[in-house]
Amino acid sequence: MMKGYAGALLRKSRLYRRITEWDWTAFGLARSALEKHAGRPLEGARVLDLGCGPRFPALLLFHTFGARATGIDTEVVDPAFGEGAGLRMIRRHGFARFLKSLARGVLFDRGYYRELRRRAERPLLFRGLDIRRMDARALDFPDAHFYLVHSNSVLEHLEDVPRALYELARTLKPGGVASVVIHLFPSLSGGHLLEWAYPDEDLPRAAPPWDHLLENRFPASVPLNRWRERDFRRELEKRFELVEVERYREGERYLTPERERALSAWSREELTTRAFRALLRRR
């Protein structure tokens, strides 16, 4: 099990520049949205990173650039990963999870953070990070608390999206903004297989394109709600004004006429749209 995981990490380590580029871009878009549409500088603003993840890149950047930022996730790796953090993780998530986190730190995270620091052009501020274990369906924050809510590739993993959006809207200040990126399930990378994370990269691949929509011989190791863009937009528009929508494309060269016929339940637009970003204001 660990051998396969280490091999996946080694492949992923070759992609950390791409992953960092995506995370840096998402941070920059959220920062610009706050300044342009809420009229506030990032420094000193209360910011929520919804689903900050084990590397917490957006939270780290918000904190480094002076925001009063909080990150939440259902499972969080201690920023100061060491002996004490390892013991806490073993108690909380088990020894296998601890080994995976340790391997990720050695094989991937160091290079990732070096690249993130290069893009930020300043030291990354790990000290004082506010990371909390919390369910997006029950945010333990007051009403109208945050000027900015950021979420990058999180909502596609949630079972109860409407409840999470209710909580997001509740905790967002009037006049505040949310910057939400959603990775779409029908896309080529939507099955969350590491080998298809970046389809334009030349990597060895066992799964055929869009296998997750057909035979699904390589099921995702993370929960996916399988929503389509129209499902997300329907729920977003109930609680927010959509100020901007931007789409990111991928996979055109893999969508042969034969594959398109096999995937006729989805439109070409759905199959070749990796993700969309919505800039939101609370209604």
Q: Whereabouts are the PLM-identified features?
A:
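Class I SAM-dependent methyltransferase SAM/SAH-binding core
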Residues: 57-138
